[in-house]
Amino acid sequence: MINIDPPSGDYPASGGSSTHYIVSESESRLAFKVKSSNNESYRVRPVYGFVDAKGKAKLEVNRLAGPAKEDKLVIQYAEVPADETDPKAPFAAGAQQGEVVVKMVAS
């Protein structure tokens, strides 16, 4: 239901940033949640949000300086009604429908 563009992130170990887009292939509005395998090195904004039907949402990723290694972001998503105002609500209710893994490499 979603794709990530670009589908991976490459950063110098000294740190860096990138912009990714969560692109919806769904006919419905989606809520998303971003999880990281390395919260010490990565900062992601927004962590929760919405993507309109067939729309896209901007995701800013910052990699802080640290040891070179591979990590991942997991972007979970769930369909939500058009009038939903809290992007955290479907995940608190266990309504997750799928997820996409984004490989993050610092070298």
Curated annotation (Swiss-Prot):
Q: Which InterPro entries match?
A: Ig-like_fold (IPR013783), MSP_dom (IPR000535), PapD-like_sf (IPR008962), Sperm-specific_class_P (IPR051774)
State the tissue distribution.
Expressed at higher level in testis.
Locate the MSP domain: which residues?
1-107
Entry-linked PROSITE patterns: MSP (PS50202)
Q: Which domain of life is it from?
A: Eukaryota
Q: Protein name, please?
A: Sperm-specific class P protein 31
Q: Which gene encodes it?
A: ssp-31
